[in-house]
Curated annotation (Swiss-Prot):
It is an enzyme of class 3 (hydrolase). Transmembrane segments: none annotated. Mg(2+) binds at residue 35. Belongs to the CRISPR-associated endoribonuclease Cas2 protein family. This is CRISPR-associated endoribonuclease Cas2. Homodimer, forms a heterotetramer with a Cas1 homodimer. HAMAP family: Cas2.
Amino acid sequence: MLKKEWDYVNKILKKIKNIRNLLQDESMYVIIVYDVNVSRVNKIKSFLRKHLNWVQNSVFEGEVTKAEFERIKDGILRIIDEDEDSVIIYQFPLNFMPKREILGLEKNPIDDII
């Protein structure tokens, strides 16, 4: 095989690999609850607002891909002090439909909740 043909084949194989990765990148629904030191509250809140929907104090939720979920976890770990702060992440497959019931005031109504 000529170098030009070999380069073309490698280019096609890379595209196939990228497509395969996209197809395997399933989405999920996550709920993140955090209790962090007051000095880090604004950092974690600002970071999570970029990825998820704010529900109420210290609670975010939304649909994310596996790749985005990993980026969110990495970002959280860069912000928190693991010896002092606590973050709980609930993961649900998209076909799982939990019932959501609000008692009292709904702090931030969202139309497209699971």
